[in-house]
Amino acid sequence: MSDRAMPRILLAEDDDSLRGFLARALERAGYEVTACADGDEAAAVLDQDWDLLLTDIVMPGLDGIEVARQAAARHPGLRIMFITGFAAVALAAGESAPAGSKVLSKPIHLREIVHEVDRMIAA
């Protein structure tokens, strides 16, 4: 984790409502969140300093796995978490997530996501 007081999370989620709920829940938990509507938007800010990438897998433009690969290449050791309703399908289709990443399946409670983010940031 960086030396900043608030860990920074890059959130990529194409569902507007879910993206808003996640961003607010994580901000209330003490995180600085940059929320992106798709993989292309997230890829455009990958050069910034992030503590965790929280991304959907199936999105318009770049999918979450490709965003995660690019993020991991630029930031070795970056914590990566996928939230998706298509985890089994997306990851079984020959796609491989970066080592050490975590996959959470939708539907999922916001509390559970915040708890998992807390655990990954603390690790």
Spans of features found by a protein language model:
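Non-catalytic signal-transmission and effector/linker regions of two-component phosphorelay proteins
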Residues: 1-10, 77, 111-123
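Conserved acidic carboxylate
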Residues: 13
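Charged docking surfaces used in two-component/phosphorelay signaling
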Residues: 17-28
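Acidic, metal-coordinating helix/loop segments flanking the phosphotransfer/catalytic sites
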Residues: 35-52
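Acidic catalytic/metal-coordinating carboxylates
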Residues: 38, 63-67
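Active-site residues of response regulator receiver
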Residues: 56
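Receiver (REC) domain active-site loop signature in two-component systems and cognate sites
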Residues: 59-60
